Each structure stands twice: as C-alpha cells, then as structure tokens.
C-alpha cells in the first residue's frame, strides 16, 4: 500500500537542506546526475548505497540489480553504459580487487552513457576486518579516483564523476 510520500532522497525542493550520511549523499549525487542503472554486490561499508537504490528504483526510474559478485556488478553496469545508459556500480573496498579484470579494460573500450564505480573504503578498520586503501588502484587501472571528505563532497563528486566519465 502506497502512502504517496516520496523517499526523502527523491524530494526535489530547491534550497532545502537535508542531512545525509556519505553513502546516501552518493545516491543523491547519482540521481542528480541522471543515473539510469545501478548494480552492486552488497557489503559493509557500502551496503546503504545499494539498499537505498533497491528501495527507490521504481519511483526513481532506475534499473536496479543485486549481482552475484562484484565482477558481475561491474560487467552489467558496463554493458548498460555501452548501451547508452548512465550507470553506477557499488561495492565494498575488497570487492574492487575482485572486479579488476573487467575494470582494467574499460579505459580502453570507453563508455557511452557515463559510468561511476563506487568502492566504499575502510582504511581505519571501523566496519570491516580488512584494511585496504583502494585509492592506489587508480595508478594501474588508469582511472581517476575521487576521494570525498564530507557528505556534500560525496554528492558533488558523484555528479562531477559522471560528467568526467
């Protein structure tokens, strides 16, 4: 049963300020950039991104998919962007290692609609048992890395990343 109320992240009220954590700010930035497809393999510290897209997908007109692993999540998002959609893919920090095979070919093939990969890190071991700083992946994958310091940075950088891609 629908209440007719939009999820707060979907409300379009220019000038209205809302308090969002970083993961939700990334979702909002993707929506503002016109994301049409989102895939992910859920895992902390990135779980809220995929879970939020799962809840709002129909109302936001975003195709959403939980994938069987991070590699598949990247591959289906890449296929969506090759078809012209603006695509996002989300994963935890350790998943980036697993998804490197398809990611490493993307700079050479290029994208059509724009693609942003969100790899939520945990360099201080706050929410995960493994420490990894995935910013170093930029060097050998030949892809830019955006490293937001605040939720507002996360929203803006997600929008900017789509334009950059």
Where are the regions a protein language model picked out?
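Thiamine diphosphate
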Residues: 1-158
């Amino acid at each position: 049963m629908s209440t007719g109320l939009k999820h707060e992240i979907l409300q379009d009220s220019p000038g209205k300020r809302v308090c969002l954590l970083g993961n939700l700010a990334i979702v909002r930035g993707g929506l503002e950039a016109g994301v049409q497809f989102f895939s992910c393999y859920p895992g902390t510290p990135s779980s809220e991104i995929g879970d939020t897209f799962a809840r709002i997908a129909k109302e936001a007109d975003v195709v959403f998919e939980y994938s069987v692993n991070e590699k598949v999540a990247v591959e289906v998002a890449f296929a969506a962007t090759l078809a012209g959609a603006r695509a996002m893919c989300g994963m935890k920090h350790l998943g980036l290692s697993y998804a490197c095979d398809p990611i490493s070919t993307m700079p050479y093939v290029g994208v059509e609609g724009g693609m942003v990969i969100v790899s939520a890190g945990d360099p201080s071991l706050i929410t995960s048992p493994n420490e990894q700083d995935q910013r170093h992946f930029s060097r050998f994958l030949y892809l830019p890395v955006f490293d937001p310091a605040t939720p507002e940075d996360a929203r803006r950088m997600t929008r900017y990343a789509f334009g950059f891609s």
